[in-house]
């Protein structure tokens, strides 16, 4: 069986490694997966790829505007690993809790995911380097401990975010891969 070729592009080394591993675990049987960290521009020929998966809309726009308008692109959406929800539920109601990440977009995304769960009544405050919101004592992180403010006394690590099932289905669909074997 001929494998499909996928390129994953992100702006962050850690995200690139994490998502590439997840893509390999899910699609490795059907696809060859390459990855690339986007800094200021992409110097790669995309014609050998059937699909580009990227970490955000800025990368998608860059590819469509500067490289190839016709290549199919999927933006990867991530969610919290269901195994770690109990860590969030254990937070006392009405607590102020920082959602800490190295990037604003990722901190906002994690806070949004937690709110969508609707399981708890806490005040989530996205935090990333450069913002001035350091009054909380509880912080939620998704694996990385690089951006934790000094005033945080309790760290709740909910692990790396995982690829959302809707993204998985979209990739299978774009590549015309039947999910049932």
Where are these regions (language model features)?
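Short beta-strand elements in bilobed, periplasmic/extracellular small-molecule ligand-binding domains
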Residues: 27-37, 117-127
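Structured core of small recognition/catalytic domains
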Residues: 135-138, 142-143, 148-165
């Amino acid at each position: 069986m001929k494998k499909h070729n996928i390129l994953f592009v992100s702006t962050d080394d850690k995200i690139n490694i994490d998502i590439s591993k997840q893509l390999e675990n899910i699609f490795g049987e059907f696809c060859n997966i390459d990855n690339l960290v986007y800094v200021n521009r992409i110097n790669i020929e995309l014609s050998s790829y059937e699909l580009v998966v990227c970490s955000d809309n800025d990368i998608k726009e860059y590819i469509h505007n500067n490289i190839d308008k016709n290549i199919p692109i999927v933006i990867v959406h991530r969610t919290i690993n269901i195994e770690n929800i109990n860590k969030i539920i254990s937070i006392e109601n009405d607590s102020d809790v920082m959602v800490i990440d190295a990037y604003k977009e990722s901190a906002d995304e994690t806070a949004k995911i937690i709110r969508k769960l609707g399981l708890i009544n806490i005040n989530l405050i996205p935090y990333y380097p450069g913002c001035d919101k350091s009054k909380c004592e509880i912080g939620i992180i998704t694996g990385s401990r690089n951006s934790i403010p000094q005033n945080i006394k309790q760290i709740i690590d909910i692990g790396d975010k995982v690829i959302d099932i809707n993204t998985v289905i979209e990739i299978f669909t774009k590549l015309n891969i039947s999910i049932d074997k």
